[in-house]
């Protein structure tokens, strides 16, 4: 009777230890129609790219970026009051607060294309640098090899 408890305890401990990703390494997961691409840095800032397959009322796929700051505060690119800008390869990519309009969609696709090739990037919230991420080109190209669902902003059956 003790052996099953030991196996269960070992399984729980193993799954808990794999839940925390190493800094500067992309991880991904899918659940409830959303693919998440997550990276953290040594300072404990987490960058979470959310690519949804769930359209809004206008059949727009409202992808977003969530940031969790070291103090536990979260900010979201969908918040009209928050400006998130990602800097990659000496170019800045301001994230639109919503998609479904030409300039916002174009800005989002440019951001996704650049992110898929970024060896490192900086993130700013309202013009204040909140994090630097350095996954390296090899990790980025492996983990973000297919961001096609993140590039699509309009839902179609």
Regions of interest found by a model, annotated:
Residues 12:
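Basic, ligand-binding patches in group-transfer machinery
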């Amino acid at each position: 009777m003790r052996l099953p408890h030991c196996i269960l305890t070992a399984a729980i401990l193993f799954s808990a230890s794999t839940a925390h990703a190493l800094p500067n390494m992309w991880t991904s997961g899918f659940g409830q129609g959303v693919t998440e691409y997550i990276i953290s840095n040594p300072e404990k800032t987490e960058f979470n790219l959310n690519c949804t397959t769930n359209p809004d009322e206008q059949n727009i796929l409202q992808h977003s970026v969530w940031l969790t700051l070291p103090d536990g505060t979260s900010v979201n690119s969908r918040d009209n009051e928050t400006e998130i800008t990602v800097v990659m390869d000496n170019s800045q990519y301001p994230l639109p607060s919503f998609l479904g309009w030409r300039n916002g969609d174009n800005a989002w696709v440019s951001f996704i294309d650049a992110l898929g090739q970024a060896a490192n990037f900086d993130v700013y919230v309202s013009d204040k640098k909140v994090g630097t991420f350095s996954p390296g080109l090899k990790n980025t190209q492996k983990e973000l090899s297919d961001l096609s669902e993140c590039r699509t902003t309009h839902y179609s059956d």
